């Protein structure tokens, strides 16, 4: 993007992001965004739900009458709030995502650097691409829905404990958690098929990255009109170990005995007992769930794969 492609961009941020000096970070990001936005507004989101309210104001032209792109600086939870704001207000505007939190799984899908300064510079060469959105009951998400161990993981992270599915080794309490997972009964309907059983973890994925690691399934795409349900069979902690380590070249076929994979457009999930649900790192819902894919629902700035190769990760 060498010209001023957009008239008015709005950059949302929280003061409590993963960036140590948020104001310096905002300066770095704004330096890049103003190269392709004629006008850039920087908007603080003070409370949960503020971004959804701002999106409705933008939709109603009460914020400004010329906003034509929205940027978000934050982690997956903040991105999730923006996606809900876009979808619930039916705001047909493209978005740009700049990493600034503990996890930025979808940033990897966009081929962007995990550092906010570099990622904002890469947006200058990015192009808009359509992505599917997941609708979960009355909420929306870009990346995944998880039950079981993945919820335990999110709660551990929120409490300041070690991340089970992140980059750290499987040692200490992590091993104990994997070896002694809590199991639950499930009944899942995917399109015209019904499956039931008992498991320690269940994931419905749209994007290919969860907890910083790639799901080792080569044709998993966030814009193919399908969602992918993964049921982790009982006593499959070694499979959990493998899946959530960074092994991009892993042969998925070797693990099919430990994981059941069900692609679908519509999914219903019932559990006994009722289970908490992790949606892109946010634990706000409980089962039962009705999930469907909304194809090509949102346009997001994406760095072409060729330009993402060999990008430095330094500030």
Swiss-Prot record:
Residues binding Mg(2+): 221, 224, 226
Domain of life: Bacteria
GO biological process, one term: phospholipid biosynthetic process
Transmembrane segments: none
Enzyme class, first EC level, given as a word: transferase
Assigned GO CC terms: plasma membrane
Residues annotated to bind ATP: 45, 75-81, 102
Sequence ranges assigned to domain DAGKc in this UniProt record: 1-140
Cofactors required: Mg(2+)
The protein's Enzyme Commission number: 2.7.1.-
Catalytic residues of the enzyme: 282
Functional summary from the UniProt entry: May catalyze the ATP-dependent phosphorylation of lipids other than diacylglycerol (DAG).
PANTHER family documented for this protein: LIPID KINASE YEGS (PTHR12358:SF106), SPHINGOSINE KINASE (PTHR12358)
Family: Belongs to the diacylglycerol/lipid kinase family.
Protein name per the record: Putative lipid kinase SSP1993
Lineage: Bacteria, Bacillati, Bacillota, Bacilli, Bacillales
């Amino acid at each position: 993007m060498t010209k001023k492609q957009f008239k008015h961009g709005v950059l949302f941020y929280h003061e409590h992001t993963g960036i140590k000096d948020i104001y310096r970070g905002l300066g770095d990001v704004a330096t890049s965004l103003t190269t392709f936005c004629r006008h850039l507004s920087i908007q603080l989101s003070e409370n949960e739900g503020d971004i959804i309210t701002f999106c409705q104001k933008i939709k109603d032209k009460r914020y400004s009458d010329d906003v034509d792109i929205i940027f978000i600086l934050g982690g997956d939870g903040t991105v999730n709030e923006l996606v809900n704001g876009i979808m619930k207000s039916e705001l047909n505007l493209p978005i740009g995502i700049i990493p600034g939190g503990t996890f930025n799984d979808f940033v990897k899908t966009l081929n962007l650097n995990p550092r906010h300064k570099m990622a904002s510079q890469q947006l200058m060469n990015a192009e808009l691409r359509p992505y599917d959105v997941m609708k979960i009951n009355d909420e929306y998400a870009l990346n995944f829905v998880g039950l079981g161990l993945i919820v335990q993981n999110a709660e551990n992270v929120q409490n300041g404990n070690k991340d089970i599915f992140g980059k750290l080794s499987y040692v200490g309490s992590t091993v104990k958690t994997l070896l002694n997972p809590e199991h639950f009964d499930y009944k899942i309907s995917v399109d015209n098929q019904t499956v039931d059983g008992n498991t320690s973890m269940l994931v419905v994925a749209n994007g290919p990255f969860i907890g910083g690691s790639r799901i080792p399934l080569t044709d998993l795409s966030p814009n193919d009109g399908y969602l992918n349900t993964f049921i982790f069979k009982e006593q499959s902690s070694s499979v959990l170990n493998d899946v959530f380590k960074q092994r991009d070249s892993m042969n998925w076929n070797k693990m099919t005995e430990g994981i059941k994979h069900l692609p679908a457009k519509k999914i219903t999930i019932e559990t006994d007992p009722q289970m908490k649900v992790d949606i892109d790192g946010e634990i706000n819902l409980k089962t039962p769930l009705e999930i469907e894919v909304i194809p090509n629902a949102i346009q997001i700035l994406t760095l072409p794969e060729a330009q993402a190769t060999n990008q430095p990760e330094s500030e």
